[in-house]
Amino acid sequence: LFMDLPAWASHEKRFSRSNIVYIVSDELGYYELSCMGHPHFQTPHIDRLAAEGIRFTQALAGSSLCAPTRCCLMTGKHSGHTSVRTNGGGTPLRAEEATIASVLKQVGYATGGFGKWGCGGRGSTGVPELHGFDIFFGYYDQVHAHSYYPPYLIRNSEEVPLPGNHGLSDGTTYSHYLIVEEAKKFIRKNKDRPFFCYLPVTPPHGIHDIPESDPAWALYKDKPWPLDARKYAAMVNMVDRHVGEIRDLLRELGLQEKTIIFFSGDNGGAEYFRDAAHPRGFHGPNVNPLTGVEFRGGKGNLYEGGLRIPMIVCWPGKIKPGRVSDLLWYFPDVMPTIAELAGATPPSDIDGISIVPELLGEDVVGRKQAQHEYLYWELSGQIAVRKGKWKAIRPGMGKAWELYDLANDVSETKDLSAEHPDILKELMALAEKSHEPAVEGEFSQPELNEKDRRAKFGDAVPPEKINVTLVQNMPKVGLIPQKNYRIVSCSSEAKTKDRLAKYAIDGDPRTWWHTEFSPEVRKHPHELVIDLGGEHTIRGVRYLARQDSAWNGTIKDCDLTTSTTPDFPEEPTVKLQFSKTREAQERLFPEVRGRYVRLRIYSEVNGGPWASIAEIGFVGE
């Protein structure tokens, strides 16, 4: 359902429909621009964009991780209403969901996306070409984007080979260059009609790679910094150069005054390259370089460091230059804003509000800028609510709520929950009414998305032909044969992600069991019961953690109970602890006789609520 066309949409008659370019720089921190006074970065083109437009001091991400925040940006919904709320990779939009692109397409816009999508892997209902994009070129799954030298990129769900590339940092064709060139081709092709060019580029997100021939590397290669810190800064400068190239192209085509450009990060800064001298990261993305005032936290949590992003908007002749705005807004507001600029009508079920009055002027638009009653975020058990100067946050599942006065404590250092229980109660009530269970899209061909995730490592071939040296294998010597095992029960499994319990005993390290995390997160303790196929002497257990790029669910504390029948005694046979490693781990104990084994899991290596197992086997005969 779409809202009736509001009266203010008639401004289209006064302003011809604009072209819209939205550039997202992945993981770029709020302070990581030279216009913010940062001495490590040189970003003259982005600085000029700010000088000729408006820079926002309180623009906030939709979430603090890649996929969830992009879903908020695309759909106009906050993370209590979105379909993509986890960052495991590939989680899809539902088939019927509207995006910025689909809204603009209805009013005649050409729509192109170039970079990292994150709202649905190949073979799912969330692919961009099903959500309004005429073309999308780049990465669909964010794990695929963890290499700048993948063997292929994706164009409208079809693979585009990249010659000479072998994954990770090994290759000759730098993906980011191709992505920017495709965006330029799109702009040239559509110069005579209104277009929406969405450019969610991957740099400076890791793996931190930049060709030695890139002019940005020459600026940083001799700095007395850690290598990856130099590469990161060079990647930021490279993105800046490409922002300049996009603007140069618009000038060349006579489109500069017909095009509004948005530039932002996607979530709060990641505090990379920490050491004793740089406890908030070598570049301090969440530390004011001029005053030392800090935003607490960073990417992955809901403190200000995880949500505050750079946001600049420029439209020559329409937006007054050199403005700095303190308007409080966030990613769900982007869709209604762009829809209004295009003379389009956004869906009626969005959470965002248009900020066009703030951009163009209330006198020009003919109405005052609307304000949010409150803003809402949720992420893997974390919850945050912002109302005016007050922010309530629950930093994790089962943790106490905290309350901060951001007007006087932007660093979130003084918890005022005890002093202002009524305010906290009000914000907690807003949080409760803001959450709806997530309803994700579906996969018809999950194997395509899995292939793209493996392509990070250079795997462009079917699973049966994978070079197994890319992952650790669990040694089979001394194990009771896995082929006889059977899953009796499990506490939960992530069925929507095809992370089933049976994969813990299938002998393939590339698949794994993961406990349910969507639509609801299942918390510890987790349990797996396995039938060994007959009575055996059991003297140990062998465990292999998941072999992809994440650690979610990797087991730490657990106990193991054996029995000759499906009924288990109260006392466990042995208590165990595993480490954070990709290599197989073995834990031996005094031998017992049994057919059934119950593994009960109490904690995860990173403190999360999940459990996952790539392979598990039992030592004995």
Predicted regions and their residues:
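Short, conserved beta-strand segments of beta-strand-rich sandwich/propeller modules, principally
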Residues: 196, 540, 596-598
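Extracellular carbohydrate recognition and processing domains
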Residues: 569-590
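Short beta-strand-to-coil "C-cap" segments at the C-terminal boundary of structured domains/repeats
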Residues: 316, 406, 613-621
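Disordered, acidic Ser/Thr/Pro-rich linker "stalks" and the adjacent N-terminal cap
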Residues: 457, 466-535, 546-553, 557, ...
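Predominantly extracellular/luminal cell-surface or secreted proteins
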Residues: 264, 314, 491, 544-546, ...
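Short beta-strand-plus-loop segments that form exposed binding edges in beta-rich domains
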Residues: 600-607
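Formylglycine-dependent sulfatase
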Residues: 1-402, 406-429, 433-437, 441-448, ...
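Extracellular ligand-binding interfaces
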Residues: 540-574
